[in-house]
Regions:
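YjeF_N-associated NAD(P)HX repair module
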Residues: 66-175
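A cross-family phosphate/adenosyl-ligand binding-site feature
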Residues: 1-69, 74, 79-84
């Protein structure tokens, strides 16, 4: 397994997943897309823990050598087009024969609209946290998310029930 990461908060989840899988005896490595963007504090913390845990760090060019890819390049906060090395890495993932599992939402999908922000990962599965994201339910994001699993992260069910919906879907939206 290879966990492919950018440097934001979502990628901290991908690094944490790699670390937990490693602790369970799964062979997993981490590839960080190297650019000049500032790392988030959460990402830096997870990277330190991963390094102290003995995880291997490899170059993103190794993507085709792995059976399973954890997509942690971008998360729900993405609001700009995917360009440069990020677009190249997404192309590499999509052209490989890897099984791809995205964290929260496939990288390159607008989490609020399901729109592709110029390039997007085509996931076989997506593990999203707390609740499903709109972008995983509306096309084209729905088509690129694969099988979506909502992981419970401890949100109080009673609190969620009291929330008013902020948007509604028609049957055409959900086809």
């Amino acid at each position: 397994i290879l966990s492919v990461c950018g440097k934001g908060n979502n990628v901290a989840d991908a690094v944490a997943a790699a670390r937990i899988l490693s602790w369970q005896g799964v062979a997993v490595d981490i590839a960080v897309i190297d650019d000049d963007r500032k790392k988030t504090e959460e990402f830096a913390t997870q990277m330190t823990i991963a390094g102290n845990s003995g995880l291997n760090f490899v170059n993103v060019s190794a993507i085709p050598e792995y059976d399973i890819i954890i997509d942690g390049i971008f998360g729900t906060g993405l609001s700009r087009n995917v360009e440069g090395i990020y677009a190249d890495v997404i192309d590499l993932i999509n052209c490989s024969n890897n099984v791809v599992v995205s964290v929260d939402i496939p990288s390159g999908i607008d989490s609020e609209t399901g729109a592709v922000l110029s390039k997007a990962v085509k996931a076989d599965a997506t593990v999203t946290f707390g609740y499903n994201k709109v972008g995983n339910m509306i096309y084209p994001g729905k088509e690129l998310s694969g099988e979506v699993t909502v992981a419970d992260i401890g949100f109080c069910p009673e609190a969620i029930k009291t929330l008013n919906p902020c948007m509604y879907f028609t049957e055409d939206d959900l086809r």
